[in-house]
Regions:
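Alpha-helical junction/boundary sensor with strong preference for TPR arrays
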Residues: 44-47, 95, 118, 138, ...
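Asp-box/WD-like beta-propeller blade repeats and closely related beta-sheet repeat scaffolds
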Residues: 124-163
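Low-complexity, Ser/Thr/Pro/Gly-enriched N-terminal "stalk/linker" regions
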Residues: 20-86, 121-133, 142
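Bacterial Sec-dependent N-terminal signal peptides
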Residues: 1-21
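Acidic/His metal-coordination segments adjacent to aromatic residues that form catalytic metal sites
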Residues: 41-42, 85-93, 141-152
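Active-site lining segments of carbohydrate-active enzymes
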Residues: 36-48, 152-153, 164-175
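Mid-chain, structured segments of secreted extracytoplasmic proteins
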Residues: 76-113
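Well-ordered alpha-helical segments within folded domains of soluble proteins
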Residues: 53-69, 100-116, 157-174
């Protein structure tokens, strides 16, 4: 009986505590998002192996495109679209070096999103050319992932490869 009573009082107290909590406000969330985006821009990854076109940046750009769209739509702020466009131009809209490696085409997700917005063919041509080359020259790499054997990375045998390349091909399909 005491346990039941104690449980009931505890549940009742938790309901009152939750009712007094103030939920996040939209302006507060946007302010935090802006701070994070600004921090990311001001603090680029220092390691040379993670340059503009490497997969960590590709993942960052995917989120930045979403933030850029929100910032422009709600605040008339195109800062983030401009930042992404500078990166694309600086790299001639090219994906990274390894043709078959899923990580190296991840940046194209944002380039294709920018193409969808601006309709500048320079933004899509390198990704389209890379894709056509891959279709015409299928990988002969193994499906067995072998540490240190780069040829086995051609077949996307690791789980996050599904985030890196397939969205590029799906977007490219929708755009062409």
């Amino acid at each position: 009986m005491k346990k039941t009573l104690l449980l009931g009082v505890s549940l009742l107290c938790s309901v009152f505590i939750m009712a007094t909590e103030v939920p996040f406000q939209k302006a507060e969330i946007k302010s935090i998002m802006r701070k994070v985006a600004d921090w990311q821009i001001a603090n680029p990854h220092p390691a040379p192996e993670h340059d503009d076109l490497n997969w960590p940046q590709g993942a960052l750009y995917v989120g930045m495109v979403d933030w850029a769209e929100l910032a422009e739509k709600e605040d008339n702020d195109d800062t983030y679209y401009k930042w992404l466009t500078r990166i694309g131009r600086r790299n001639c809209w090219q994906p990274d070096k390894r043709f078959y490696h899923a990580d190296d085409i991840a940046v194209s997700q944002s380039f294709l999103d920018l193409y969808r917005k601006y309709k500048d063919e320079a933004m899509i041509i390198p990704t389209l050319a890379r894709t056509e080359w891959i279709v015409n020259h299928p990988s002969e790499g193994s499906f067995e992932l072998v540490e240190g054997d780069l040829k086995t990375l051609e077949r996307w045998t690791w789980c996050d490869a599904l985030f890196m390349a397939p969205p590029v091909y799906a977007k490219l399909y929708m755009l062409t």
